């Protein structure tokens, strides 16, 4: 009887421990975010760093440049990065500021390095409410979201769980990227929202990104010319190395035509 009790107690202890570990893994890495904050505050001079809060969190950053335009652009970075990451988000941010748009770039929740799409999926509830808070703060007549990679996953989660809200248009960059042997868990038909979408992917992008591009084309098959534009950037990889200029010019051309 004592041995049975010990085995039962040991089993319950393991279950409780695994539950605690799993729960701990479903929160952003705030230490890493604090380090990011300390780094970017030393070199960001063209934007205000605004501290926002959400239903789930007390403090996270939004880079904000208000140019008194009717159009605001919210940038969502890729996995584990920050609102001024140098490959895609910051070049876009600076160039769009120079054009005269109101430009905002949100710190999305991050995990420790090496985490996969499936790990990040567990914290999408935090990105949902961060995006909601950012859009409430911006509150422009026309709100466009540009989202890269995991930022695109988080945007789709936001739309699926909270709604399209006051979003006027979407630009997806490298959307649909997942790790090997993983699949997208957010099942959403963007065509039902009837807003303009520009989906950009690279010639040498991940297979999952190209598969998602095909899914979008099928979703928009009846209204494709009206709402969906698709662009493949030649000689580019997922981070558009050496092709950032073409990416930015394509984005600006689409925005101007809205």
Regions found by a protein language model. Give the residues of each.
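Classical Sec-dependent N-terminal signal peptides that target proteins to the secretory pathway
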Residues: 2-24
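A conserved short beta-strand
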Residues: 165-177
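The feature captures the conserved acid-bearing segment of alpha/beta-hydrolase catalytic domains
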Residues: 174-232, 237
């Amino acid at each position: 009887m004592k041995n049975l009790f010990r085995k039962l107690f040991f089993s319950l202890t393991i279950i409780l421990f695994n539950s605690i570990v799993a729960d701990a893994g479903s929160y952003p890495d705030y230490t890493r975010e604090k380090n990011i904050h300390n780094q970017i505050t030393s070199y960001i001079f063209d934007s205000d760093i605004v501290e926002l809060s959400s239903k789930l969190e007390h403090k996270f950053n939004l880079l904000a440049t208000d140019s008194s335009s009717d159009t605001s652009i919210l940038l969502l970075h890729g996995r584990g990065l920050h609102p001024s990451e140098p490959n895609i988000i910051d070049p876009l941010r600076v160039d769009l500021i120079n054009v005269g748009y109101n430009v905002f770039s949100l710190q999305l929740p991050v995990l420790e390095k090496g985490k996969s799409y499936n790990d990040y999926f567990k914290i999408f509830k935090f990105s949902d409410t961060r995006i909601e808070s950012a859009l409430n703060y911006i509150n422009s007549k026309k709100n466009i979201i540009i989202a890269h990679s995991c930022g695109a996953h988080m945007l789709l989660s936001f739309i699926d769980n909270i709604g399209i809200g006051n979003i006027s248009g979407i630009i997806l960059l490298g959307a649909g990227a997942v790790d090997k042997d993983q699949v997208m868990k957010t099942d959403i038909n963007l065509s039902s929202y009837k807003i303009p979408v520009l989906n950009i992917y690279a010639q040498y992008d991940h297979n999952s990104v190209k598969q998602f591009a095909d899914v979008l084309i099928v979703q928009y098959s009846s209204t494709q010319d009206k709402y969906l534009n698709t662009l493949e950037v030649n000689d580019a990889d997922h981070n558009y190395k050496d092709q950032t200029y073409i990416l930015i010019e394509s984005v600006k051309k689409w925005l101007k035509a809205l």
